[in-house]
């Protein structure tokens, strides 16, 4: 073996390398045992309802804890290595930064939208979180956690965070001008969340878009249209528009007209209107608060019957089924009363020619007698 290698691979160094590899191997093996037994033990201790939140904390830090165990084994293995003594200060900083990153990972998991934490906070403080507020708060908390983690890691490597913040203060005006649209979209999102004109899954209509709300972010809101297209609208634009939320209807209106022939006897028409009102009052799908069935107009060639009522359901498919059932019953009632539907048409009166000529002759005689 060359002399320059012999100074590295001495008996003591080989023993230290063996110890380092053994430490790393033990920690790799214990990582599986740690995951299998340690977390099972924690789960068994947290089966009671009062410790449900602790169980969620364990779930959030499951994977970060596994990697921490591996990182700890790697750090100890490097520490016993005979070749990296001079690099240990830098390695220690990297190790501490890795711990901060793993802690950040676990906290981000803990603040996920589906986390039990949001449910408990919502119950404890009665915040009335909906499907929009929870994702928004989740993203906001994650941003704060990541920003703090980056700041701690930067300070670990002696980076002057205060100077960076001061630099942002000096360039704040330029940043505000450059990010004017982003800031307006952010505050537009806050307005939407606080006023709650809609929530995830609602069908809304604005001057810009009509569709189902899929998600709201710091910058924009995404909609799924009836054609299946995904439309993204900036929050600043959405917060300044009139928003119609069709999902929040308590009942759905049905209004239409029926044309009845002038040949229909008036008695039959009166009985038909009375029967139609009774039918709507007794229909289980119709709201009884407002029911209007009226003969309201004399048209050119028909009587006009006006209908206005509301269905109890706001679901579009159920509303169509109720409308179809009512239409069939209208046909039955009008048919039973002998009422005929009017068709678009025009009456043309034709006079015979000889009658017109006789009228003209008589008119000429009268004019001569007067003369």
From Swiss-Prot:
GO BP terms, alphabetized: transmembrane transport
Gene disruption phenotype: Cells lacking this gene grow normally in minimal medium or in high-osmolarity environments, and exhibit the same survival capacity as the wild-type strain upon a drastic osmotic downshift. They sporulate and germinate normally.
Major localisation: membrane
Membrane topology label: Multi-pass membrane protein
Transmembrane spans: 9-29, 58-78, 98-118, 133-153, 159-179, 183-203, 330-350
InterPro entries cross-referenced by the UniProt entry: LSM_dom_sf, MS_channel_1st, MS_channel_C, MscS_beta-dom_sf, MscS_channel_2nd, MscS_channel_C_sf, MscS_channel_CS, MscS_channel_TM-2
Pfam families assigned to the protein according to its UniProt record, in alphabetical order: MS_channel_1st, MS_channel_2nd, MS_channel_3rd
PANTHER family listed in its UniProt record: LOW CONDUCTANCE MECHANOSENSITIVE CHANNEL YNAI, OW CONDUCTANCE MECHANOSENSITIVE CHANNEL
Family: Belongs to the MscS (TC 1.A.23) family.
Function summary: May play a role in resistance to osmotic downshock.
Protein name: Uncharacterized MscS family protein YhdY
Organism whose genome encodes this protein: Bacillus subtilis (strain 168)
